[in-house]
Curated annotation (Swiss-Prot):
Gene3D superfamilies: 3.90.1010.10. Its main location: plastid. The active site is at C122. Highly expressed in flowers and pollen, and at low levels in roots, leaves and stems. This is SufE-like protein 2, chloroplastic. The lineage of its organism: Eukaryota, Viridiplantae, Streptophyta, Embryophyta, Tracheophyta. Participates in cysteine desulfurization mediated by NFS2. Can activate the cysteine desulfurase activity of NFS2 in vitro. Cysteine desulfurization mobilizes sulfur from L-cysteine to yield L-alanine and supplies the inorganic sulfur for iron-sulfur (Fe-S) cluster formation. It is found in: Plastid, Chloroplast. Residues 1-32 are annotated as: Disordered.
Length: 258
């Protein structure tokens, strides 16, 4: 497997504080002066992820270690984030929360801002870099010229960075509906951002999986336009016994050509 050793796990957005935010909660001065998200009950504490309450949590305030015991499943992360946004009833509070997440997004190298990494269909410029690590887990980096779009990317990366390919493919756009953010008639464009970034993550994940399987079988890697992903009446792509990561019964939810 061809893996870049320099591609490191990204810092994930900070989880919700149980106390009223102070200036220290927002190291970026732009956000300390303009935004003060309303206090929210910590959703992490309300979800039983099967860990001992006295044992160290697999979460930290700033990062989720990919090497930590993965009782922290992708579905758990998604549920935590959805619960957080659901608790914010005012649209402006959701916008502020996204801006907070945008500030935590790791910078993307200038060399990655190329047309091949552009996410199509977004009203703003969004770049997405995807790799597969030596353990067969997906690694994502992203950036945008819009702070709101950066917030979307930050949330999706927190959910999916370090996930197995089948976990990436298992997330649907409707799973993100509770996190929709819209102010002044911009709801649809922002819903499209969620959708387009997620779809790009999934399409390119499938391309990397197919390329890796072909490489290990000694076959010619498939061209992107040769890949047709389709989900019909519960049909699935069977697991390959060649590669070393779990992709058994991978659902192909979408009907599209890359």
């Amino acid at each position: 497997m061809n893996t870049s050793s320099s591609f490191k796990a990204l810092a994930s957005p900070p989880l919700i504080s149980t106390s009223r935010p102070t200036t220290k909660s927002f190291p970026n001065p732009r956000f300390t002066s303009r935004f003060s998200p309303k206090p929210i009950t910590c959703m992490r504490d309300s979800l039983n992820l099967g860990s001992n309450p006295k044992a160290p949590s697999p979460f930290s305030l700033a990062t989720v270690s990919v090497d930590a015991p993965l009782g922290t499943k992708t579905s758990d992360k998604l549920r935590i984030l959805v619960s957080e946004f659901r608790s914010l009833t005012e649209p402006i509070d959701r916008v502020k929360r996204l801006l907070n997440y945008a500030a935590t997004l790791a910078p993307l190298d200038e060399s990655a801002r190329i047309s091949e990494n552009r996410v199509t269909g977004c009203t703003t410029q969004v770049w997405l870099e995807i790799k597969m690590d030596e353990f067969g887990r997906m690694r994502f980096k992203a950036d945008s010229d819009s702070e709101i779009s950066k917030g979307f990317c930050s949330c999706l990366i927190w959910i999916l960075d370090g996930a197995k390919p089948e976990e990436v493919m298992g997330v649907r756009s409707e799973d993100l509906s509770e996190m929709n953010v819209g102010v002044h008639g911009k709801e649809q464009s922002r819903v499209n951002t969620w959708h387009n970034v997620l779809m790009s993550m999934q399409k390119r994940t499938m391309t990397l999986v197919a390329t890796d399987v072909a490489h290990q079988r000694g076959q010619r890697p498939p061209h992107q336009h040769d890949l047709l992903f389709k989900y019909v009446n519960g049909s699935y792509m069977e697991s390959s016994k060649v590669h070393d990561y779990s992709i058994s019964l991978l659902p192909l939810y979408y009907d599209f050509i890359i």
